[in-house]
Structures are given as C-alpha cells and as structure tokens.
C-alpha cells in the first residue's frame, strides 16, 4: 500500500472515528439526559459538565481528544507530509462536528482539534492547554477561551515547529468558523458561562 493510499484510508478512518459522539454515548451509558436536548444543546464536554458533572465531562473530553490524537499520531509516525496531516486532523474534526452516525449534528470540535495538534509536541500541547485554562478561569466563557486559543495555536506552532503552521492554521480556522454563533452571543452579552451540575 502506497503512502498516498494509506493517507486516504487514514482520512476516512479519522472522519469515522470523529463521528462517534462521546458526549451522547457517555450520557446514555450513565443515564444522563441527551446533551443535544439539554443545556446548550451542544454534544461536548462543557455541556456534559453542566448536565452531568465533572467525571462525565472528563470522560467525554478524553474520548474527544483521543479521536483527534489517534489518527494524527498514526499519520505523524508514518511520515505523512504536514498538509496531509492537517487534512487528516480536519477530517477527525469534521466527523465530530458533522457525525454520520448521529444525523450530522455534532459538537464544536475543540477537544478533537486539541487532540490532533498534541502529537506535534508536548510544548504546543502545554501552551494550548495553559491558554485555555487561564482564559476560562478569567472569563468563565468556554467558547471565548476556545476561540482565543484557536487563534493563538498557529502562532505557538510557528514559534515551536513552523513545519506545521499551515495545518494548524487550517484547524484553527475551522474552530473559529464553528463558533460563529457563540461569537454573536458573546458580542450581545448572551453567552452562557461555564458551570457544573450541582450535587
């Protein structure tokens, strides 16, 4: 099997893996409400935190990150070129955002994108994670933190390993576009802040 064919197989596999909605499955297994019909309506870790608590949200976060990290790391180890690596990462995110197994109604793709970027290096992963955490703690807006971190990601990548600046910029653009409704709500002061289920 040539590297080109293998890359295409990984792209398809990345989309299918991304299409497995961790939030919906975790909530179903744990007897929680469907995140697509509760809270913000977004099947992601932040909404699961609101309706199901920290442990469920952490499990969703881990699974969503793994969906991006696994195909990206595999492609990285096989020597796939940076642009194709970016396409693979985007395929995983598109699977999360438009999941074929869940009526093409998915999440924002933030955790999956982070997972896809992580194989580039620990330094980048730490910079992204630190930026998101600081912004959430300061503003209490998960969406604002995600948007700002996505915008910072290509800058961090250029600084740490410029070979991957373009694919990371591709991912960041997708994340920002996916948050267009959040941006509108932020500008109107109508965006929900991060909260957790009270026990």
Curated annotation (Swiss-Prot):
It catalyses: an acyl phosphate + sn-glycerol 3-phosphate = a 1-acyl-sn-glycero-3-phosphate + phosphate. It is found in: Cell inner membrane. Pfam families: G3P_acyltransf (PF02660). Pathway: Lipid metabolism; phospholipid metabolism. One of its GO terms (biological process) is phospholipid biosynthetic process. Probably interacts with PlsX. Belongs to the PlsY family. This is Glycerol-3-phosphate acyltransferase. It comes from Shewanella halifaxensis (strain HAW-EB4). The lineage of its organism: Bacteria, Pseudomonadati, Pseudomonadota, Gammaproteobacteria, Alteromonadales.
